[in-house]
Amino acid sequence: MNNTALGAENKKEQTINFISEAYEKFYYEKLKEVRYQDVYHKALCYCLGISDDTRRNINSIYDFKTGCVKTECLHEGWQTSGSMKVVRMAFNLYCNGTPSVDDYTKTEEQVNECRRYTVEDLFCCAYAPFFWQAIQIRYPEYATYNRELYALFGGAD
């Protein structure tokens, strides 16, 4: 059975920006441990490598055996405001949603948690350029202008 995420990958080689050598090493090491080499897992590994805190606590965030995120990590004492942004961005790109919202039972708490996934909340930090890189990894087919595709639509917006 074909994995549709594999088909979503751009055939062009992509330059990936890293904050540090430790970050780059983490990314390539964790890619070997995930279950699939698709854009979902690449974006997850890239995002979770952004912060030293998330690199150190990767096993509290993601289960490499099951392929499931561990939303309870957002309540752990090691988290900082920055690492929580990193985790939420990673979860959003990997799960296509806001999985930690289900950790709450009260509607108001769920809404507040959902708000923490907004562009404004996530991108208002020093990690924003790396979040944009993660989006490009996750959505390579949309991250660059495609003249051929544009022409297929008659060159009109």
Model feature map: region roles:
Residues 1-84, 88-91, 95-157:
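Extended, charge-biased low-complexity segments
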